[in-house]
Amino acid sequence: MRLIILVISILISNAGSLLRSLEDDSNECMFNCPKRARNVSVPHTEKTCMGDDAIIAQILDGYNKLDLPGGGHVVVSIEIWVQEVSKIIEITSEFELDIYVTERWTDPSLAYSHLNPCKSNMSVDGATILNKIWNPHACFVNSKLANIHESPFKNIFLQIYSNGSIWHNYRIKLTGPCSSTLRTFPIDQQRCMLFYESFTHNTDQVKMEWITTVPPITILKGNITLPDYVLVDFSSSSELRLYPPGIFNELIATFTFQRLYGFYILQVYVPAYISVFISWVSFTLGAEQIPSRTTVGVNSLLALTFQFGAVVNNLPKTSDVKAIDVWILSSMAFIFASLIELAVVGYLSRDGQHGSIKCRCSWLCMNCKDWTALKIDQMSSIVFPVSFLAFNIWYWFIFLGKLLVRTI
């Protein structure tokens, strides 16, 4: 009996010790278990992906930028985005624009899909990495000035895909040449062309071509309008260009600008009309108002001359006879003719109102009436407007029409 009681007491004592131990462990776990949990390492069964810096370091290790990708005959696709055309300078026949140029090619040596990359493409510092890899060294060979934008940093974007495809884009401000005959000025067009080609690789090494999956030239603004011009057409083409080092692919971007001639209609043509019309007023003043008629005619001629000079000063020096030259000179001729008519009337009116021009028509076997100053004024008030109307029909419908057809 005593033995049973002793065993029970031992069990009760051990149970109390066990409960106190569990309580102590619970209190300790309340503060220390998180630390222990952090120290526990869970086995990672998946392979960790490789970051961009590690990939760049590995693919450039032993890379030679002088070697042609794939052994040669690299295909480089070109795309142009036109951001803005800032101005067209007629005196120097050039235009200034901001564009994005995109170059795409494939370099198998830069493929990194086997390196378990974290993403299928990576954007890198174009200004730095581009100098370490092969690139086509292409440029606008006919540009007068070209600068890559550097605000707030150099605007060069370079993206490398896991299969080795390269996407190179940069934003550039350049000045290129334009051509125009000016024969139809002010209803003329400016045709501006940019030639893009590889500067160091001929067709045996690199094939330059326009991109085919999307339009090769895109106007980002939708339409481009300048104070004097509006962009009416743009196109892309290519041709082979022969140089001493070989044959090169040349990509051509053509931009056609139509002049907005509303300014010249208001500032040149309308004043010319008014000057010619004013010169006709002298026909109604009579032979007695010779000084007044002279003032009207001379002032009209001087006003037209100064107006013409202001327009010519803003145009390039060219030997072509422009449409506006024909208009201004013809208008001057009409005003000058009115002054000649005034001189005849003044001559007839020197001896009074009975002065006249004797006609001798014996060779026609008919009688001629004498031409008095009044009759000459009356005839001039009809002949001059009719002649000017005929000139306008010829100028606007025949002369300009033929010039426009010839220059298209």
Swiss-Prot record:
Residue ranges annotated as Cytoplasmic topological domain: 284-295, 347-380
Signal peptide residue numbers: 1-17
Gene3D superfamilies documented for this protein: Neurotransmitter-gated ion-channel ligand-binding domain, Neurotransmitter-gated ion-channel transmembrane domain
Localisation: Presynaptic cell membrane; Cell projection, Axon
GO CC entries: axon; chloride channel complex; presynaptic membrane
Subunit relationships: Does not form a functional homopentameric ion channel. Forms a functional heteropentameric ion channel composed of acc-1 and acc-4. May interact with acc-2; the interaction does not result in significant heteropentameric ion channel activity.
Protein name (record): Acetylcholine-gated ion channel acc-4
